[in-house]
């Protein structure tokens, strides 16, 4: 019986590069991306002992993995900026909108940095 493969070797190499580009995120939050072989890559989020991770998402497309990790990175940065302030009640979009334009530009500019490291064209 032949086992089904859900990700090509080419896409697997691209996903690996994307996952490696976001090491900064893994140090900021309880998030990790794991290569699960023929199944693709799994993003594990919010570790809660003794049960393990609260959420998981499986990726077989490097572009989708990049966008998922980018959104997690941006949300975490916005959360850390607004932590403990009533500003967080507005949600991440509200926090972002309340930032000065210069700070917004810096955050958005980081997406290009991550894309370059990950080999993703924006």
Report residues per predicted region.
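Alpha-helix N-cap recognition
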Residues: 61-62
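Flexible, glycine- and charge-enriched loops at secondary-structure boundaries
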Residues: 8, 55, 100
